[in-house]
Structures are given as structure tokens and as C-alpha cells.
């Protein structure tokens, strides 16, 4: 890719919508045709096994920092592809806010979203479809409904 601009891609969507699969397939395809990309997987998966689900806005703030750290480590010439959109941490923090003090984390995450936009961090945001909208094989992560 003859360009001085990196093109970073994030895949967003709800649980079990194929974000990781889509990101991995895109990464493999771009590598096969000669582009230099890093694949940055969802950091919370690694920590969820040890600590359980992250719900509080302050836990979302922490996960933002962990995920962002991995994105900033990317050195690939053409950019990175990730299956964990930082914006979703703000959305989930706002959703799970229960106490008045939670608004501190929610406000800070909103500010960080604005900084992402100012930095033009993501050049493409791909939205994974709802698994009920597209036919595909069932696996152990999805119910048989």
C-alpha cells in the first residue's frame, strides 16, 4: 500500500454477532494480498476468565485503557484491525450506570470518544449483523432457538 496514512478498522456489534470471525477473516485476506496489518483481539476476553464480566462504568473505563494500550502498540505499516470497538465501552458504561458516581466514568468515557474522533483513530467501523438476521451454522456460543 503506497500511502503514508494507516487505515485502522474496528468491528462493532452485539454479543455473538461474528465480530471476531469477521475481523480475523479481513485480517487474513488483507495479509494474503500483501498488506501489513495487526490483528488486535478483544482484551476483555483474556481478563474475563479471571475476573468475570465487566459491568460497572469504572470497569468499562479500565477495559478501555487495556484495549487502547494494545491498539497503540500496533506497528503494522497499513494499520490494525480489531474486534473490540472502544466506543462500545462508553455505550455499555452508560447502560450499566446505576449510582450517581457512575456518571464520572461515563463522562470521562464520552470525552475519550471525542478524542478518538479528533485523532481520527478509526477510519472504518464495520458493524457485524445480528446473528438472527443472517443464516449460519450454530456453535457452542449460540443458543439453538
Feature map (PLM): residue ranges:
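Phosphate-binding P-loop
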Residues: 1-8
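Hydrophobic anchor at the beta1->P-loop junction of P-loop NTPases
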Residues: 11
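The conserved Walker
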Residues: 15
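Conserved lysine of the Walker
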Residues: 19
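Hydrophobic positions on the alpha1 helix immediately C-terminal to the Walker A/P-loop
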Residues: 22
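Conserved substrate/cofactor phosphate-moiety recognition/catalytic segment
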Residues: 27-68
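Conserved nucleotide-sensing/catalytic segment adjacent to the nucleotide-binding pocket
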Residues: 52-101
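A glycine- and Lys/Arg-enriched "phosphate-lid" helix/loop adjacent to the NTP-binding pocket
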Residues: 96-145
Amino acid at each position: 500500500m503506497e500511502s503514508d496514512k494507516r487505515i485502522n478498522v474496528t468491528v462493532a456489534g452485539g454479543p455473538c454477532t461474528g465480530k471476531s470471525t469477521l475481523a480475523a477473516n479481513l485480517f487474513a485476506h488483507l495479509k494474503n494480498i500483501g498488506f501489513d496489518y495487526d490483528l488486535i483481539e478483544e482484551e476483555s476476553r483474556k481478563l474475563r476468565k479471571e475476573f468475570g464480566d465487566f459491568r460497572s462504568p469504572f470497569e468499562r473505563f479500565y477495559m478501555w485503557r487495556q484495549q487502547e494500550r494494545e491498539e497503540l502498540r500496533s506497528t503494522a505499516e497499513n494499520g490494525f484491525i480489531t474486534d473490540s470497538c472502544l466506543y462500545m465501552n462508553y455505550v455499555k458504561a452508560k447502560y450499566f450506570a446505576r449510582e450517581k458516581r457512575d456518571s464520572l466514568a461515563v463522562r470521562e468515557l464520552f470525552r475519550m470518544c471525542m478524542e478518538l474522533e479528533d485523532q481520527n483513530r478509526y477510519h472504518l467501523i464495520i458493524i457485524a449483523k445480528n446473528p438472527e438476521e443472517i443464516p449460519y451454522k450454530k456453535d457452542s456460543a449460540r443458543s439453538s432457538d
